[in-house]
Each structure stands twice: as structure tokens, then as C-alpha cells.
Regions:
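Short loop/turn elements that form and flank the Walker-type P-loop nucleotide-binding site
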Residues: 1-5, 34-36, 66-69, 87
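Switch II (G3) loop of P-loop NTPases
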Residues: 2-26
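Hydrophobic "anchor" residues on beta-strands that sit immediately upstream
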Residues: 6, 33, 40, 72-75
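Walker B catalytic acidic pair
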Residues: 11, 45, 77
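Conserved ATPase-coupling elements of RecA-like P-loop NTPase cores
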Residues: 17-20, 49-54, 82-86
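Inter-motif core of Ras-like GTPase G domains
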Residues: 22-47, 63
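Alpha-helical scaffolding segments of alpha/beta enzyme cores, especially the outer helices
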Residues: 31, 56-59
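C-terminal-of-GTPase-core extension/linker across diverse P-loop GTPases
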Residues: 48, 59-170
Length: 170
């Protein structure tokens, strides 16, 4: 993980039975997320209408042409529901009040991003090693192998940030 920078955006809560202006606010906030690498959809599993909520959000995502964005569904409060069955994949059952659950989220996000991002191997001469810090903010650097003439870095990077690797090539 290192210094990978992420941006989290929160939308208004559930949108069914909301005043029209809040529904449009939800849609516009969600629409701003069209270019994200990973959309995290948090569901209150203890809400008896959670399946309808999921369907509504998925329908809006389809309307906004966002159904191809990789999505991770987090079911919060699933521990409060007997025999809870998730309806979306990939998913994780979480409890926002549990410290273990919060710590596991970072690892879960990194694993999901590794699934989405492309693997790269990069030879960086010592003369360009000062640029590695900038790379750490947009890529997951998995391995750094120091050699006589520089280092070899293996990691993961998004399609839209692949151009950042070009500055290391001669």
C-alpha cells in the first residue's frame, strides 16, 4: 500500500422516498464518480428493505451508464441479521463499530485494486529514483529490488495512470 492516495466521496444516504432535490443531488454526486477505479457501495444489512435499496442504486448506476465500474459492496451491520445472505459480489460483511473490521477494509481495498489495476515491472536507474515518491501516490508498489544500477519495482497501476510510468523510460 505505501503512500497510495485515494479519494473517498460519500453520497446522501438511501434515496427512496427522498425529496426530488435530494434524489437529483444523489444522482449528481454518483455521476461525479463515473471515472473512479473502484466504487464502494455500503449497504445497511439490518434494514429490512436493503435489497430494494441495492436494486434502486444499481438501476441509477445503469441509467448513468456506470454499470461497468468495478464495485465492492460492503454490508454493514450484517452481524445484527440472522442468516444474512448477500446479494451482490464481490462483497464483504463489516461492522463499522469493530476495529478489526475497519483494519481489514484497507487490506480488502488494496486486494480489490490489485484485481483492477495492471501489473507492471519497472527498472529505475538511481538517477531517476527521486521520482519514485510521486509514483507511490498513484500505484501500489509491491516489491522493490535494489541492484547495482538502480532498482526494479513491481507493482500495480490503473489504466489511467499508466502514463506515469513513461517518465522512467529513457
Amino acid at each position: 500500500g505505501g503512500n497510495l492516495q485515494v479519494t473517498l466521496t460519500d453520497t446522501v444516504g438511501f434515496i427512496q422516498d427522498l425529496p426530488t432535490e435530494l434524489v437529483s443531488s444523489f444522482k449528481s454526486t454518483l455521476e461525479e464518480s463515473k471515472h473512479v477505479d473502484l466504487l464502494v457501495h455500503v449497504i445497511d444489512a439490518s434494514n429490512p428493505y436493503h435489497e430494494e435499496h441495492e436494486k434502486t442504486v444499481l438501476s441509477i448506476m445503469k441509467d448513468l451508464d456506470m454499470e461497468d465500474i468495478p464495485c465492492l459492496t460492503l454490508y454493514n451491520k450484517a452481524d445484527l441479521v440472522e442468516d444474512f445472505t448477500p446479494t451482490q459480489t464481490p462483497y464483504a460483511l463489516i461492522s463499522a463499530k469493530s476495529e478489526d473490521s475497519r483494519e481489514n477494509l484497507q487490506a480488502l481495498f488494496l486486494e480489490k485494486l490489485k484485481d483492477i489495476f495492471e501489473v507492471f515491472t519497472l527498472r529505475v536507474p538511481f538517477s531517476k529514483s527521486y521520482k519514485i515518491h510521486d509514483l507511490e501516490s498513484v500505484a501500489i508498489l509491491e516489491e522493490r529490488d535494489y541492484q547495482d544500477d538502480g532498482e526494479v519495482i513491481t507493482g500495480y497501476i490503473s489504466e489511467k495512470n499508466k502514463w506515469r510510468l513513461e517518465e522512467f523510460y529513457d
